[in-house]
Curated annotation (Swiss-Prot):
One of its GO terms (molecular function) is aminoacyl-tRNA deacylase activity. The keyword Transport does not apply. The gene is proS. PANTHER family: MITOCHONDRIAL RIBOSOME PROTEIN L39/PROLYL-TRNA LIGASE FAMILY MEMBER, PROLINE--TRNA LIGASE. This is Proline--tRNA ligase. It catalyses: tRNA(Pro) + L-proline + ATP = L-prolyl-tRNA(Pro) + AMP + diphosphate. The lineage of its organism: Bacteria, Pseudomonadati, Thermodesulfobacteriota, Desulfovibrionia, Desulfovibrionales. It comes from Desulfovibrio desulfuricans (strain ATCC 27774 / DSM 6949 / MB).
Length: 574
């Protein structure tokens, strides 16, 4: 493709409203343009990136035995009412009515539609498994769309679905998709991790997220250095390997703690470590108030609380609720004689001699033994993991890092098929409910994540499988007949070798072409100018390393083949 005939409106500066680096560079590289809040136009170069990602996804999905279909973006509200998600999904579901007052929504996902399709067709276990997928535009009415393609309202997604007759079959489908996702993200040249994850609004029995590692990632993941355990911090289990206290605990005593609302203020006042303090946090769980206890140097993981109580909504209680329940302002709540259910983090079990709030202003209790002095409803893993924790699987060293979620697979179980009566007859003629899995990849999000992970001060540094072109060919002297003729010869040669090449044939200064070549992030650069041709060479540059070299113009096919393989191997061995 020729630069002069391809619409690539590059920018020298980043637009003021662009926040993250992928958003800035996608705009500067002329790959996308904002239409309105959360909606983007994919320009030719950006669409090439999206299509290359989608092609890799399709190839691996087909290889895994999933078959492509295409479902409508507009979905009838009646299907969502069958599963209860019409009421529970929230304002992110864009609802509307047609001229006949029938309710519809723009699909953020397609579980209801695919289940309706399959329940209308499948009657016997002999027709299972059914494994289907689509690459489709989705819409989620985000309250604050931001970060460009990272969190837009409209986005491109691959969503796949499996229907099985048995739990064993469903687990096989899930494993097939897990392996396919590992292949997809490996082929795309991204550094990533598969992590255990919460099922969120999709629901189901368990799930894995696929995270592109990047310092700018919105999610934090915890992984073990000594085994394969990795999980989103929302899901990460905590292994407490301490020993319960064996010493006796003195009688509980009320003490004055004026103005000590926080753990930091309390430790300074009493001279005790934060680990000797128990925080009592009040939450509203589906409208009912509960208390959660964690050590003073820990944080509550509200997702774990939500899962423990099988709740729909969990939020921190406001100051008015705290005052009403404890008769004290925020900072002085405690578990003793508290008239709401109390859930304590397992790390506290067996421990004694704690400092807790006294449910009275400017007062705390010391020498508290939770088993003796408080009515704990249940003990459970309720705190957020830290880098100081041991691996829950092998006891090894844990590390926390940032990541960008680009894929998510779910073992849905019976969540949708039971609600929508998706049934079949088994080999004994007995009616059974289909067991489902669903599998998503944010295709447009992958493009942004690839840039978040791979960029430098000059622009994008695309991995070869994601880049819009493999090579950019720079004509430094388009007014020279000799240079033009050689450039055309090289252009034809590269195309004949099966190389995707962008020919920069613009009548621009060399400096402009060099800057744009770096900005676009195309992995390989070839530079043709009069001086080089006079020496019989073509200059080359590896965009990732910045390493420059020279290739013989006389044996360019062989030299380019060897050099390009070196560039690809460099990416593979990162």
């Amino acid at each position: 493709m020729r630069f002069s005939s391809c619409y690539i409106p590059t920018l020298k500066e980043s637009p003021a409203d662009a926040e993250v680096i992928s958003h800035k560079l996608l705009l500067r590289a002329g790959m996308v343009r904002r239409l309105t809040s959360g909606l983007y136009i994919y320009l030719p170069l950006g669409l090439r990136v999206i299509n290359k990602i989608a092609r890799t996804v399709r190839e691996e999905m087909e290889k895994a035995g999933f078959r492509e279909l295409l479902m409508p973006m507009v979905q009838p509200g009646d299907l969502w009412k069958e599963t209860g998600r019409w009421e529970h999904y929230g304002k992110e579901l864009l609802r509307f009515k047609d001229r006949n007052e029938r309710e519809y929504c723009l699909g953020p996902t397609h579980e209801e539609v695919i289940t309706d399709l399959v329940r209308g067709e499948v009657r016997s276990y002999r027709q299972l498994p059914v494994r289907l997928y689509q690459v489709q535009t989705k819409f989620r009415d985000e309250i604050r769309p931001r970060f460009g393609l990272m969190r837009g309202r409209e986005f491109m997604m691959k969503d796949g679905y499996s229907f099985d007759a048995t739990a064993e079959g469903a687990e096989e489908s899930y494993k097939i998709m897990y392996d396919a996702y590992m292949s997809i993200f490996s082929r795309l040249g991204l550094r990533f991790r598969a992590v255990e994850a919460d099922t969120g609004s999709i629901g189901g029995n368990f799930s894995h997220e696929f995270m592109v590692l990047a310092d700018t990632g919105e999610d934090t993941i915890a992984f073990c250095h000594d085994c394969e355990y990795a999980a989103n911090v929302e899901r990460a289990e905590v292994a407490w390997r301490g020993s319960p206290s064996t010493g006796g605990c003195p009688a509980m005593e009320k003490i004055a703690t004026p103005g000590a609302h926080s753990v930091e203020e309390l430790t300074a006042l009493l001279g005790v470590p934060a680990s000797a303090i128990v925080k009592t946090m009040l939450f509203k769980v589906d409208g009912k108030t509960v208390a959660v206890l964690v050590r003073g140097d820990r944080e509550v993981n509200d997702i774990k609380l939500k899962n423990l109580l099988k709740a729909q909504e969990v939020e921190l209680a406001d100051a008015a609720t705290v005052q009403a329940v404890t008769a004290a302002p925020v900072g002085f709540a405690g578990p003793v004689a508290l008239d709401v259910p109390v859930y304590a983090d397992a790390e506290l079990q067996g421990g004694t001699d704690y400092v807790v709030g006294a449910n009275a202003a400017d007062a705390h209790l010391k020498h508290v033994d939770l088993a003796r002095d408080a009515a704990v409803t249940a003990w459970a893993d309720l705190r957020a993991i830290t880098a100081d924790d041991q691996c829950p699987r092998c006891g090894g060293r844990m590390e926390l890092t940032r990541g960008i979620e680009v894929g998510h697979i779910f073992m849905l179980g019976l969540k949708y098929s039971e609600a929508m009566h998706a049934v079949f007859l088994d080999e004994n003629g007995k009616e059974r409910t289909m067991i489902m899995g669903c599998y998503g990849i944010g295709v447009s999000r992958v493009a942004a994540a690839a840039i978040e992970q791979n960029h430098d001060e000059h622009g994008i540094v695309f991995p070869p499988p994601v880049a819009p072109f493999e090579c950019v060919l720079l004509n430094l002297d388009p007014r020279s007949e000799e240079v033009n003729a050689k450039v055309e010869e090289i252009y034809a040669l590269l195309q004949g070798m099966g190389i995707e090449v962008l020919l920069d044939d613009r009548e621009e200064r060399p400096g402009v072409k060099f800057k744009d070549a770096d900005l676009l992030g195309i992995p390989m650069q070839l530079v043709v100018g009069g001086k080089g041709l006079g020496r019989g060479i073509v200059e080359c540059k590896d965009r990732r390393t910045g390493e420059k070299g020279e290739l013989s113009a006389a044996s360019l096919e062989q030299d380019f083949a060897a050099w390009s393989e070196k560039v690809r191997q460099g990416w593979a061995s990162r």
